[in-house]
Amino acid sequence: LNNEQLDYSSAAAVEVHDRGLALFRGKAGCISCHGETALGDGNVSNYDKWTEQLVDAKGRTEEDRLEPYRTSFQKYGALLPRPIRPRNLRQGVYRGGRRPIDLYHRISQGINGTPMPNQEQTLTAEEIWSLVFYVRSLPFEHASRPAGVRNLDRERPN
């Protein structure tokens, strides 16, 4: 399966899209960072891999973990570490390019130094292409409320 050879209006495209959605929410584990609706609102407390090793391993509060930076590095002008925000996939802007092959490489190889894992050992090539197809469809879909989420919007009085 090559994403560029697929007729987007065909029944096969619907099947590939649905397979990609199932992988996104399941086996690939994308929702843990990118969120249920791929808005980048999943886990937002990850740091880059280098900082994560320095500040995250001992179960301390974030305030405690950042104390060494405040007391030693900051006086020399170093900035405090900041969490890496997962990409909002609905915007259609991706690190490393938006061509199908670019997304395939991002998913299969991951992004070095970030929490974005490689999926090469987890997913087959066909599964990665299904995921690419699904991710490329996201900017054109309405971001809907995930199933099971309560509607907390209140009606306004007239």
Each model region followed by its residue ranges:
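Short, solvent-exposed loop/turn and secondary-structure capping segments
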Residues: 35-37, 41-48, 117-119, 143-148
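Conserved beta-strand positions that form and line the central face of beta-propeller blades
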Residues: 16-19, 88, 115-118
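Sequence/structural segment immediately N-terminal to covalent heme-attachment motifs in c-type
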Residues: 12-36, 43-61, 131
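Short, solvent-exposed loop/helix junctions and linker helices
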Residues: 10, 14, 27, 97, ...
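C-terminal capping alpha-helices of c-type cytochrome domains
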Residues: 1-2, 100-158
